[in-house]
Structures are given as C-alpha cells and as structure tokens.
Curated annotation (Swiss-Prot):
Pfam families assigned to the protein according to its UniProt record, in alphabetical order: ATP-grasp (PF02222), PurT_C (PF21244), RS_preATP-grasp-like (PF22660)
Function: Involved in the de novo purine biosynthesis. Catalyzes the transfer of formate to 5-phospho-ribosyl-glycinamide (GAR), producing 5-phospho-ribosyl-N-formylglycinamide (FGAR). Formate is provided by PurU via hydrolysis of 10-formyl-tetrahydrofolate.
Annotated ranges, domain ATP-grasp: 125-319
Gene: purT
Lineage: Bacteria, Bacillati, Actinomycetota, Actinomycetes, Mycobacteriales
Compositionally biased tracts (Basic and acidic residues): 386-397
Stated name of the protein: Formate-dependent phosphoribosylglycinamide formyltransferase
EC number in record: 6.3.1.21
Region described as Disordered: spans on this chain: 382-403
Protein family per UniProt: Belongs to the PurK/PurT family.
Length: 403
C-alpha cells in the first residue's frame, strides 16, 4: 500500500498543529519528544506518574493509568492527536484497537503490534510458532508446580521471566531446582502487571547478544520499506542493560541472518516506526529473543554514533518522512544508576565526567531514584569501539548521585 507524509506540517499550539501523543514518557520517550518538536510537532506526553522525564519537555502532560481503557480513550478523544505512540508495555491495547477502528488517530506502529509485543507470550508465539524463527526452548506457566515441571523438561540453567516486564525486572537465571521457587516469586513481583504467568526459557550458550535496530519507514517509492542500523552489542546484568556499543563486530553470515530475522518479525508486526530486535548470536547462528516496537534502551548509543539517532529515526518514520541510518563513528554508552533510594537527588562529578574525551551525558531528570534505577547515561565516541567503551565506563564512574 502506498503511503505518504502529512501534506502540511502545522505550527504547534495552533488549530493546524500536527499532534503526537506519547503513551509513556521516560528517558526514551523524552528523546522522541525532542526529536518530534524539532520537526515542529505538538507533543502530548502521558505517563503513570507526575513529572516524568517526557512531561518536562512536552507541550502538554497528563498523568493517568494507561492500563485503564476508559481513561485512555477519554484522553485520546480530548486531545485528538493525529498519531498515538506507545512507549511502554503497560497499556490498554484494546483501547488502541478502538482508536484505530474509529479512525481517531494512527497508532504507531499498529494496535496489533502493540498487543503482540506487550507480553512475551504473544511475540514468542508469533516468532517461533507462526514465523518459524529459531529461539531458545520455552514454556509458559502460571503456578509454581507448572514452573517446576517446565524447568524439568527444559533443563538447567534456564531463565524465568514475567510475561510482561521492562528493563529486566523480575528476570532471573536458575541453575538448579533450589532456585525455582525464589525465581517464580521474583517474576511475579517484577511484572509491569501481575498476570500470574511466566515464561521459562532454555539457556542459549551465545557468543554475544545484539540489538538490531530496524526501521519501517516510507521509502523513495512511496512504499513502506525496511532499513537497518549497524548492530549494537550490549552487556546485561540481571536482564538490565549496563553497556552498549556500535557497531558490534559480526561475520557477514551472522549479520545477514540477523537482518533476515529482524525483517521477518517486523514485517509481520507491520506499521511504521523503529523496532529494537534482540538477538543471540552463536558463531553464524542467530536466535530470536524479543522485539520492542519502539526505541530501545541499548540504542541510546545512537545519540552520538549515527547521523540520525534512533529517536530521530522513530520521529521521521512516524511522520512518514525519509530516514537515514548512516553510522558516523564507533561509540558506546554506559549506564549511570541512582545508587540511592531518594527523591529529588543531585549529581556530583558531572564536569569530571564530561572531561573524558569525546563524551557526553544524559541525566534523565527522573523525580525518584532507586539504587538500581537508570538515572542517566554516558555516551562516548572514539576511533574504535573498545576506546569508546573505556571512555563511557570511565565517564559514568565519575558521576556520583547524592541524596
């Protein structure tokens, strides 16, 4: 189907404005908002708590329970955006389907894609059972007894995760039967919404894992095409990213296979926008892990490595504009954690951190800090990935959160 950008972009805060509503306004949403505003778009930021990072820069901000379909539909009807862009998982996806059916707004990428990716069950069944993509062995369970049985069939080590969570919350690796009950309880506590259901995954003995940022955007022929960023390598701790770098060195065969997998799953989801496709790589073999239909946390590195960051690419794809995935320099990112449980924290050492060559910081402005909450990121470039990684780690270590 041939698609096109809006014929005319309006002026924010006027009757002719082009309006985008973001559902979820954390640090990734904040960067998307800034990218949209640079294109003259009026942005409405929505989150579950006041003064979220995106709230602080949007034209208007709302605090609602986005898992409440009536509240979400009321807000969409009130604001009448042209585009509704989910940025988190915990959203009433039935309400998004209603928005699409009524023609109230365009849902990015689609209501169906949001529904399928909001929990690990929907996307895993699509990838493995419908598309036939290689994945780790897996089972779903909704009681401790079912989890125990699943681990016996899959074997140890294995990974137990909530069917819906973000940033690694509720995820743990289990190495023997003694850890199963603790992992089950941790998964129930860590889900965005407690469905009482988990996925038990076999452990993939991978060489490394990547995020293949994949953009579905309108090409020169007026058709939606698929565009790839260079692969992003990353390290995780308890399922939460702590470092990322771009490009990740890969064999030609592994890179081609990664893009084949990414194109298949994103085409099946449809719509426009950027997708973060997480993959395990073992030699030339590639295994699908997860996909997010939005900018990916590991993609924060693109703030300095690409001509257009993942956030700018998402903004352009949303609006039907051309995209450019050119890599301009090797780079890396390293997470700055809160370190303390407190509200309204400060940061010491910022000048020292920014004295590291070719380094920038993003402090997200989250109103509440936790010891393991991501409160900022250091992003560095260099002549090669290893230099950039060393610089990013050093810069992040110089920032000290203080209550």
């Amino acid at each position: 189907m041939r698609e096109q950008a809006p014929v005319r972009f309006g002026t924010p805060l006027t009757a002719g404005a082009t309006r985008v509503m973001l559902l979820g306004s954390g640090e990734l949403g904040k960067e998307v908002i800034i990218a949209l505003q640079r294109l003259g778009v009026e942005v409405i930021a929505v989150d579950r708590y006041d003064n979220a990072p995106g709230h602080q820069v949007a034209h208007r901000a709302h605090t609602i329970d986005m898992s409440d379909p009536e509240a979400l539909l009321r807000l969409v009807e009130e604001e009448r955006p042209h585009f509704v862009v989910p940025e988190i998982e915990a959203i009433a996806t039935d309400a998004l389907a209603t928005v699409e059916e009524r023609g109230t707004a365009v849902v990015i990428p689609t209501a169906r894609a949001t529904q399928l990716t909001m929990n690990r069950e929907g996307i895993r069944r699509l990838a493995a059972e419908e598309l036939g993509l290689p994945t780790s062995p897996y089972e779903f369970a909704e009681s401790l007894e079912e989890v125990r049985a699943a681990t016996e069939r899959i074997g140890f080590p294995c990974v137990i995760k909530p069917v819906m969570s973000s940033s690694g919350k509720g995820q743990s690796t289990v190495r023997d039967t003694g850890g199963v009950e603790t992992a089950w309880e941790y998964a129930l506590a860590g889900g965005r919404i407690n469905y009482g259901r988990v996925i038990v995954e076999g452990f993939v003995d991978f060489d490394y894992e990547i995020t293949q940022l994949t953009v579905r955007a309108i090409g020169a022929d007026g058709e939606v095409g698929t565009f790839f960023c260079e692969p992003i390598g990353h390290l995780q701790d308890s399922g939460d990213y702590v470092e990322s770098w771009q490009p990740q060195p890969m064999s030609d065969a592994a890179l081609a296979r990664s893009r084949e997998v990414a194109e298949k799953v994103t085409a099946a989801l449809g719509g426009r926008g950027i997708f973060g496709v997480e993959l395990f790589v073992k030699g030339d073999d590639v295994y699908f892990s997860e996909v997010s239909p939005r900018p990916h946390d590991t993609g924060l590195v693109t703030l300095r490595t690409q001509r257009l960051s993942e956030f700018e690419l998402h903004a352009r794809a949303i609006l039907g504009l051309p995209v450019d995935t050119t890599l301009t320099t090797p780079g890396a990112s390293a997470v700055i954690y809160g370190g303390v449980d407190a509200t309204g924290i400060g940061f010491d050492g910022v000048a020292d951190a920014m004295a590291v060559p070719e380094t920038d910081l993003r402090l997200f402005g989250k109103p509440e800090s936790f010891v393991r909450r991501r409160m900022g990121v250091a992003v560095s470039t260099g002549p090669d990935v290893e230099t950039a990684r060393s610089r990013a780690r050093e810069a992040a270590s110089r920032v000290e959160p203080v209550a």
